[in-house]
Amino acid sequence: FTVQLDLSETHLWEPGKGGLYTLLLSFGEDRVKSYFGLRTAKFQGRKFLLNGKSLFQRFVLDQGFYPDGIYTAPTEEDLVKDIQLSFAAGFNGARLHEKVFEARFLYHCDRLGYLVWGEYPNWGLDHAHPLSTETYLNQWSEAVERDFNHPAIIGWCPFNETWGYREEREKNALLTSLYKLTKRLDPTRPCIDSSGNYRILSEVYDIHDYDQDTQSFQARWDGLTDRIRETGGVIPAEDPFFNSAPE
């Protein structure tokens, strides 16, 4: 069912601040307490806009790994600490990598104004198995539907580094299905079918560059935005472009 709420005052959910509304639903003796946030997130041209304002995504890659809990945080304080450490280092969010994170972690992201991209673990996926695609699509659907209302999630990225997909048709079909499924479940957020390397459908063409030499890294990418402007936004098919750049 649909409920329309009249708000006595309105404020937007903001990075680094949060800004949540408390929601209390009651029906007879039953009561449910929750929360929500109001914000917009989209790409426009070469810019990412949050609440209509250009925002540079300065993110860490967070795998949610803990020495004492492996892929489960030992305590809730550990979840909060990860966010606080990232903020303290000058970042404003994280790409949640190769894992569907705890809903409690996403709550603290919402509360603190920590931006994240949602992802799913695709490492070791056996595409030749007849149940592989069905299982993956079902579980990814559950993840998107569970986390749809978190204002901290500003985009979806179901796959990571799809090596060897260009030569295998069934893998390409899965990427296409994933993108279309994600946009059908949530048309409000941008989606990258696969971050890094090969892709089929995507609103963002991102790159992974692991060069640890700052000079060669700068030489490779310096002036990229100027080259794009000179060609009117047209670049060679094999050359990626950044999804955002600081102004």
Where do the language-model regions lie?
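Substrate-binding/catalytic cleft of secreted carbohydrate-active enzymes
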Residues: 81-84, 93-247
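Secreted/periplasmic carbohydrate-active enzymes, especially glycoside hydrolases
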Residues: 1-98, 102-103, 108, 112-113, ...
